[in-house]
Amino acid sequence: MPTINQLVRNERKKVTVKSKSPALKECPQRRGVCTRVYTTTPKKPNSALRKVAKVRLTSGFEVISYIGGEGHNLQEHSIVLVRGGRVKDLPGVKYHIVRGALDTAGVAKRTVSRSKYGAKRPKAGAAAPKK
């Protein structure tokens, strides 16, 4: 605990909070252009081919972002909306592409957690048959 004299000489330092998604520049989302769409493998012990895209954002940053859901329509020069949120088993991937926004299509035939994947509500007649 510092004395009053010590506080007069040296004021208390403010704790600065470092952003986990600096490329968004304090915005909730950013628009960007895909420069490369490819698959990559996760860290041990997981095994898969995760779909990712390198995106040039309007903030000037070039980031690697994850494409969630089954199947996608992205290719080079696609315009995408990028949000924060890292992928734990992919090093360097700290952003997600928003499905159903701009050039990114929503996930087809998605019935649960639809809002996260840009999927419309299915028609009442096309609902799954009850058991």
Curated annotation (Swiss-Prot):
Superkingdom: Bacteria
Key words of the record: Methylation, Ribonucleoprotein, Ribosomal protein, RNA-binding, rRNA-binding, tRNA-binding
GO-annotated molecular function: rRNA binding; structural constituent of ribosome; tRNA binding
Pfam family, one: Ribosom_S12_S23
Covalent S-S links between cysteines: none
Statement: the UniProt record of this protein carries the keyword DNA-binding: no
Signal sequence segment: none
Modification type 3-methylthioaspartic acid: residues: 89
Biological process (GO), any one: translation
Gene Ontology CC: one annotated term: small ribosomal subunit
Gene3D superfamilies attached to this UniProt entry: Nucleic acid-binding proteins
Family: Belongs to the universal ribosomal protein uS12 family.
Function: With S4 and S5 plays an important role in translational accuracy.
Quaternary structure and interacting proteins, as annotated: Part of the 30S ribosomal subunit. Contacts proteins S8 and S17. May interact with IF1 in the 30S initiation complex.
NCBIfam families xref list: rpsL_bact (TIGR00981)
Protein name: Small ribosomal subunit protein uS12
Species of provenance: Campylobacter concisus (strain 13826)
